[in-house]
Amino acid sequence: MGAPPGYRPSAWVHLLHQLPRADFQLRPVPSGFAPRDQEYQQALLLVAALAGLGLGLSLIFIAVYLIRFCCCRPPEPHGAKSPPPGGGCVTWSCIAALLVGCAGIGIGFYGNSETSDGVSQLSSALLHANHTLSTIDDVVLETVERLGEAVKTELTTLEEVLSVRMELVAATRGARRQAEAAAQYLQGLAFWQGVSLSPVQVAEDVTFVEEYRWLAYVLLLLLVLLVCLFTLLGLAKQSKWLVVVMTAMSLLVLVLSWGSMGLEAATAVGLSDFCSNPDTYVLNLTQEETGLSSDILSYYFLCNQAVSNPFQQRLTLSQRALASIHSQLQGLEREAIPQFSAAQKPLLSLEETLNVTERSFHQLVALLHCRSLHKDYGSALRGLCEDALEGLLFLMLFSLLSAGALATTLCSLPRAWALFPPSDDYDDTDDDDPFNPQESKRFVQWQSSI
């Protein structure tokens, strides 16, 4: 099948499409896009479950590390004031992990924007395709109504005026038959009329889902950013309560990061399967939803020399009918106007109607060509399979970096918390120091007693 203009499956699509797939019984599953197939659904769920496995391993590792830290820590000498060896390394490793998490947040914002741009391009292509289809229906309807009105008024009036000349009446009736035939041929060109599938509704649904997806990721990114910043603040101020709160928040964000990674991985794999060969699935789905013939859908989705225009015969017959009407009207003008002055007005009106109809016909020929709708199809595929897929991969990288950074932070924070000086150390000051809080309090009491 011919690829749409400007679209070629990217290297990421080929790479993800080649990954093996298996169902819950670990049996191989074909990589063709089949979202309604139960085995294919299980394969995507299994891809998402790999993130759950990563979360479980992370939690087990963190738990084992903290248990070892709590149970196997050597006792500190009584009255020791100096920090244990390796304390600075622990703090700096925690800070480095948080900085990596902040870098991942920037990657996440970029990926979220790329995904949103791709979905917006898909919605714009759907809206433009709907405009083309609606214009075809409107032009056909206006042209058919214009020809019908001409048959009812001008041609009927012309027959009455020329009733005494049977050969002129016959020519007028011939023009009537050709006008009715042209209207019938043109009416069959409005192929989208009465179809239940609305590209506008699809675009609105896609935009609605994308708005909430974008907002959810922005909130997740901001949450990760706040956790990283407040954790760094807690380490800088050596605030135990802030570190404890951020430890709990880090655990929550760790779960969210792995969860988002599973969703992103399953979506990216499914999207790569679709983008590797989109024509077959889109053609079958559109035929199922619209009931249109495969000839029409193949013409617009493939748009190559191997597929002929299914409307070519109707267009040719319509053009011949209009040319025949034009020829008959010219003959009537030569024969009827010199003898019947009352025939001039309906003939001029018919000539004007025919000129407008021919202009509409040429516009209809351009609209029915596969080039415009096929261009929209290619634009939709580029938005979905290039920008959106690239954004998903950047979001996966963000989730991986944030999960790794938060796992390292959860291992480091308890050790860093243990290195903080106790609150009693702040009261170990000289009694004669004027900046001593106790001395300042006594000074205020003495001043108030004077």
UniProtKB/Swiss-Prot annotation:
Sorted UniProt keywords: Cell adhesion, Cell membrane, Chloride, Chloride channel, Disulfide bond, Glycoprotein, Ion channel, Ion transport, Membrane, Metal-binding, Phosphoprotein, Transmembrane, Transmembrane helix, Transport
Annotated gene: Ttyh1
Transmembrane segments: 44-64, 89-109, 215-235, 241-261, 391-411
Tissue: Expressed in the astrocytes (at protein level). Restricted mainly to neural tissues. Strongly expressed in brain and eye.
Maturation and modification: N-glycosylated. Contains high-mannose, hybrid and complex oligosaccharides.
Annotated phenotype, changing residue 165 to A: Significant decrease in hypo-osmotic solution-induced chloride conductance but no effect on cell membrane localization
Keyword NAD: no
Cytoplasmic side: 65-88, 236-240, 412-450
Record protein name field: Protein tweety homolog 1
Glycan attachment points: 130, 284, 355
